[in-house]
Amino acid sequence: MLNRRALLRNSAAGAAVLLLPQATARAAALRDGRFRQGVLSGDPTPDGITLLTVLDDVEGKGSVALEVATDSAFRKVVARKSIATSAAAGWSVKARVTKLKPHERYYYRFETKGSHSPVGRFQTALPADSNETVRFAFFSCADYTHGYYNAYQLMAREDLDFVVCLGDYIYAESYHAKGKTGVRDDKIGKTNSDNPGIVREAVSLADYRAKYALYRSDKLLRDLHAKFPMVATWDDHEVQDNYAGHAPRGGLDASKHYTAARKAAGYKAFLEAMPFLQTGRSRIYRALRFGKNVDLVMLDQRQYRDDQPCGDATVPPCPGFDAPRDYLGRSQLDWAKRRLASSGAAWKVIGNQAMMMNAELPGGNYYGFDSWQGYVTEREELLDRGDHRRGLLG
């Protein structure tokens, strides 16, 4: 049990804890709450990490204790802090811990007066001058109803530095019902008679928050998070299938019931639920360096894009399909070009949410234009640079 005196010793513990926006207010320690969603770490740097948990079964507002140590028994504590949370933040508890040692393993836990979280662990990133091998795995498109999370169990057995989520961590829509086309049920959200292929879909902030709780009810996912840091981005299903964030009505027809409020709810739930180093109100594109070998460039391919060409259909390229249109948006595209051009890493890894290459089907049809193949002008501008092609993966 962490006590007030121990928390006040934080300044002498060795590491520093930066409280993220939802955790800046003073609050008394919470007496209740459960940690059913487990613990998460993310965006490791040589000297820092973001730590997160989300409380259940709690009311009012208050604070949660965070403790970071170099051993699993917490005899060698390097950081302690009390973090405020409330219903307005979805009971998300998030902090950035800094002044850590490069490529070191640490352990962490959260606690209220009546409950404590599982213990998580993480390893900070390699220092800039390190030539050591970097090991990571990635996942995406994790529809809860469509299959079990056995792959997470296999990942957790590996010796990894971190894992990458390339988007679709949740699915706002449930397309499958247990016993029919699905292996388990997701009954969150509302039905939409205009979309008979969808069983239910999230439309409110409460719905989107409930999605993260449902997906993390799977022990294999919680165990993966407790073992490795995650570097995450979003794709479309964190809001709505195939929406285009910079297009009127999301580029969707009226039957999809897309609204700006729905997008805002999806974004807020994601920002509450994911352990990453946020650099702006809703900016999630960023880059992380791992020694001399890996520069991981995480993109946002939803928020700034224009509508897909050709009605986003599975058809041959239509007239004007290769006309200039935004996919990353000018600011992000210029940032990515500068980062790739200036990176001296052996491998420059692009965190893509959709395929970079064309997906041409028999008969000359393209498998939709939601990916880079619908935004060829930006793709060519990003890749048509000899100074950063060497060692480029995406």
Name the predicted role of every residue range.
Residues 20-24:
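C-terminal segment of classical bacterial N-terminal signal peptides
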Residues 1-15:
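N-terminal secretory signal peptides and thylakoid transit peptides that target proteins
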Residues 2, 26-93, 100-394:
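Long, structured stretches of catalytic cores involved in phosphate-ester chemistry, encompassing
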Residues 14-16, 26, 96:
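Terminal low-complexity, poorly structured segments
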